[in-house]
């Protein structure tokens, strides 16, 4: 499907789901700002895009810091073009049971996920409104429905869904849609670290997860990228305020 070349920003795209989304949007014909906390860590994703003939820019920014976000978005606008696709993917985990969870554990997760999505969305919306076109895709999680040891993460990921629906109401009349993707178990460095923390080999951890998933496999970053590509497309202009669980079966 041919569509206009847009400028996309994908936060947390040095690796994992974000990297897959950035590469997919580039293959869709968009210029992609590969944004992560450490600019040098973005090199792998940028190289993958440019070696495939795409256009990408590495951008180092802390999504939880207002000045950092403002500077990053202005840099993208000047070097790649006005951003009209935003994927709020940056995320961290600081898992612990409630009685062991520190205030720092809580704040760190809230800041990256929710404050980050707020600051990024607020910074790019003016470019979208000017273009009369915008696509915001927020990464939620099946953990939004509750997950032991993730009071902070599940609250943040549920918050992303409410934030998404409000953006849909506020920005719809300007040609801007906002949707959320809630991944289930996806094979990434983050889930590998979870396996290590609970004392399982990653292969056993994945097998246990797959046994509970109707399609009988764990997800890949590309599964999320496929859905993000759809939400970012021109053809998805009548889809807004939705949460899609990309989890191999029904979740909500």
Which residues does each PLM region occupy?
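Alpha-helical segment proximal to the catalytic Tyr-Lys
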Residues: 126, 169-173, 237
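Short C-terminal tail/terminal secondary-structure segment
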Residues: 2, 229, 240-252
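Short, small/polar-rich loop/turn modules that mediate ligand/substrate recognition or access, typified
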Residues: 82, 172, 177, 239-241
């Amino acid at each position: 499907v041919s569509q206009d070349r847009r400028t996309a920003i994908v936060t947390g795209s040095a690796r994992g789901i974000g990297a897959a989304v950035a590469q997919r949007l580039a293959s869709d014909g968009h210029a992609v700002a590969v944004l992560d906390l450490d600019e040098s860590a973005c090199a792998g994703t940028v190289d993958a895009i440019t070696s495939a003939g795409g256009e990408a820019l590495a951008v180092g920014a802390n999504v939880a810091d207002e000045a950092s976000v403002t500077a990053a978005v202005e840099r993208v606008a000047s070097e790649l073009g006005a951003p009209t696709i935003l994927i709020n993917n940056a995320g961290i985990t600081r898992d612990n049971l409630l009685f062991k969870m520190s205030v720092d554990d809580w704040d760190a997760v809230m800041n990256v996920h929710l404050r980050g999505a707020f600051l990024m969305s607020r910074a790019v919306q003016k470019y979208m409104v000017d273009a009369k076109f915008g696509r915001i895709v927020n990464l939620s999680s099946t953990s939004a429905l509750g997950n032991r040891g993730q009071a902070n993460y599940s609250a943040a990921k549920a918050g992303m869904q409410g934030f998404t629906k409000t953006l849909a109401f506020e920005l719809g009349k300007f040609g801007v849609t906002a949707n959320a993707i809630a991944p289930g178990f996806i094979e990434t460095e983050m889930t590998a670290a979870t396996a290590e923390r609970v004392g399982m080999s990653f292969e056993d951890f994945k097998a246990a997860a797959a046994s509970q998933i109707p399609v009988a496999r764990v997800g890949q970053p590309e599964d999320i990228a496929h859905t993000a590509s759809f939400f970012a497309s021109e053809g998805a202009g009548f889809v807004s305020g939705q949460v899609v669980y990309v989890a191999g079966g029904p979740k909500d």
